[in-house]
């Protein structure tokens, strides 16, 4: 698998130069304190990770449960958080970013936890690839919810023991977003996670999936307590966004830099 990934890296990084301009600009603006040499090193390591991630995701179609849990494991404290929520018969929301191998993290959760995992996603326009992604994500029991149906489906599932996962680092429409500084840039953040959590009073668990070595990841979890009342909108959003920012700074090569995350300008 990883010999193939090394070949794909040469193709993607050196020959096709896939989104090199977007990645370089994102890195330079996110880390103004780093030298050009340091930026290039992060960029190269990112493309190696990106190629590994691409092939690891397809490996989901054939990997066994035993091997899945071996390659993407829970920290003991992480398992304890999920087990305690199950004992309390408490559904909750998962917040995470495009960091590490989020697909494998979802697989391991579905294998190891009592909660039924639902993942919020955008259906792809290409029916073939949408079907392929659906098979990969649901192979170990995970279920998918289209983003437009999120609140409705969560309310319909309130009698069940569920965990609903949100990827929080996508790019919302600027006039409906919460704006804050993220990686040294003015950034729109989804407020929907915070609004839903407060509406249905579900706990939030922030998850990070750290790359330990090539092909191996460890899942860390932290429970974010909901305040009884908010003095201002955005408090919870800022908490989980700062957690992600800290994770990215600690392992900058393991975040998805190919996205045009900062394509929107703050409305005046």
Residue positions per predicted region:
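Membrane-anchoring hydrophobic helices of lipid-metabolizing enzymes
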Residues: 1-96, 130-135, 141
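Hydrophobic alpha-helical segments typical of transmembrane helices
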Residues: 23-26, 105, 132, 192, ...
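Catalytic core of membrane glycerolipid acyltransferases/transacylases, capturing the structured
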Residues: 88-148, 171-187
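Generic structural "secondary-structure junction" signal
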Residues: 18, 63, 74-76, 101-104, ...
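Alpha-helix N-cap/helix-start and coil->helix boundary motif
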Residues: 47, 79, 99-102, 126, ...
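Soluble or luminal CAZymes and related metallo-dependent hydrolases
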Residues: 19, 74, 146, 236-239
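Short polybasic/polar patches that bind polyanions
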Residues: 25-29, 111, 138, 198, ...
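Non-catalytic C-terminal accessory region of glycerolipid acyltransferases
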Residues: 37, 41-44, 83-87, 112, ...
């Amino acid at each position: 698998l990883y010999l193939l990934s090394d070949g794909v890296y040469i193709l993607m990084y050196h020959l096709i130069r896939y989104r090199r301009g977007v990645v370089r600009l994102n890195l330079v603006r996110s880390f103004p304190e780093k030298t050009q040499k340091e930026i290039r090193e992060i960029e190269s390591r990112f493309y190696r990770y990106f190629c590994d991630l691409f092939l690891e995701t397809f490996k989901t179609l054939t990997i066994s449960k035993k091997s899945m849990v071996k390659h993407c494991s829970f920290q003991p404290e992480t398992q304890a958080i999920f087990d305690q929520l199950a004992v309390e018969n408490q559904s909750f929301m998962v917040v995470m970013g495009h960091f590490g191998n989020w697909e494998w993290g979802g697989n391991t959760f579905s294998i190891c936890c009592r909660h039924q995992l639902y993942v919020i996603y955008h259906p792809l326009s290409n029916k073939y690839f949408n079907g392929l992604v659906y098979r990969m994500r649901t192979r170990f029991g995970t279920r998918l919810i289209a983003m437009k149906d999120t609140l409705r489906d969560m309310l319909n599932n309130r009698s069940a023991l569920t965990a609903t996962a949100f990827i929080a680092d996508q790019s919302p429409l600027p006039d409906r977003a919460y704006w804050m500084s993220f990686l040294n840039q003015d950034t729109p953040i989804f407020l929907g996670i915070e609004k839903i959590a407060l509406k249905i009073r579900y706990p939030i668990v922030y998850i990070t999936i750290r790359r330990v070595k090539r092909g191996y990841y460890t899942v860390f979890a932290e429970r974010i307590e909901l305040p009884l009342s908010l003095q201002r909108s955005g408090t919870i959003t800022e908490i989980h966004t700062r957690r992600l920012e800290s994770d990215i700074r600690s392992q900058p090569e393991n975040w998805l830099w190919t996205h045009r995350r900062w394509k929107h300008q703050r409305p005046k």
